[in-house]
Design a protein with these regions (language model features):
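A short acidic, Gly/Pro-enriched loop at the edge of an enzyme's catalytic core
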Residues: 99-106
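Class I SAM-dependent methyltransferase SAM/SAH-binding core
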Residues: 42, 48-95
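Conserved class I S-adenosyl-L-methionine
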Residues: 1-36, 145
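Core SAM-dependent methyltransferase catalytic element
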Residues: 188-208
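Short alpha-helix
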Residues: 157-174, 179-180
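Conserved beta-strand signature within the Rossmann-like core of class I S-adenosyl-L-methionine
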Residues: 134-142
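Short "lid" loop at the C-terminus of a central beta-strand within the Rossmann-like core
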Residues: 114, 142-147
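A short, conserved alpha-helix within the catalytic core of class I
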Residues: 114-127
Length: 208
């Protein structure tokens, strides 16, 4: 799909929903990043901005990207309203064709899924290369189908964290896998219903 069509698709998704006034951060990000010293963070696919705002509130300097111009404009507005405009830079970016410049201590890809065609491996490889030494990339993927999931096909197969790491194909002399596992939690859907879901958690650290 052409980049312009991808932008239009995701803009339509966000415009079909009321703008979030108090977006919440993802659970896996908070439980992991809470133990890291604040530095420069990159949020890939920032969506409503809950992760970027939480990180900024913890002292991080955040570059937050999304393909949707609506999403990044809404995040910039929220950051300004919370007095975090100096800590959050919201950038519209089509990651399949470009990548934000800079080096980062934390790169977060939370549920970077799409119903459109997207080859994630090169994106995550570029992300790993943008880490500073001792920086970490946190990739959290869906590991199960929730009642509110886009795809309700019960036969869908979710790649394991180990398979995602292998697909990225990083040199073990420069990067190491710190964590690759499945964690379960009770999640709340857009309609307020709850269900147990599985998260596939991958943490890659740059060692050199």
């Amino acid at each position: 799909m052409p980049a312009a069509d991808t932008v239009t698709f995701w803009n339509d998704v966000y415009l079909s929903r009321p703008a979030a006034t108090n977006p919440q951060p993802n659970v896996r990000l908070t439980e992991i990043a809470a133990h890291l010293p604040a530095g420069d963070a990159l949020d890939l696919g920032c969506g409503n901005g809950g992760d970027a705002l939480w990180l900024a509130g913890q002292g991080w300097r955040v570059t937050a990207t999304d393909v949707s111009t609506v999403a990044v404009e809404r995040l910039a507005t929220l950051a300004g309203a919370r007095g975090l405009a100096d800590r959050v830079v919201a950038v519209q970016c089509e990651l399949s064709s470009s990548f934000p410049p800079g080096k980062f201590d934390l790169i977060s890809a939370q549920y970077l899924h799409t119903p459109l065609d997207l080859d994630r491996a090169p994106i995550l490889r570029s992300a790993a290369q943008a880490l500073r030494p001792q920086g970490r990339m946190l990739v959290v993927d869906h590991g199960s189908v929730a009642p509110w999931s886009w795809n309700q096909d019960p036969s869908i197969r979710f790649p394991s964290p180990q398979e995602v790491a292998e697909d990225i194909g990083l040199d073990s002399s420069t990067w190491t896998v710190e964590r690759a596992d499945v964690s379960r939690r009770v999640a709340t859907g857009p309609d307020g219903s709850t269900a147990e879901v599985a998260d596939h958690v991958l943490i890659i650290r740059r060692t050199a």
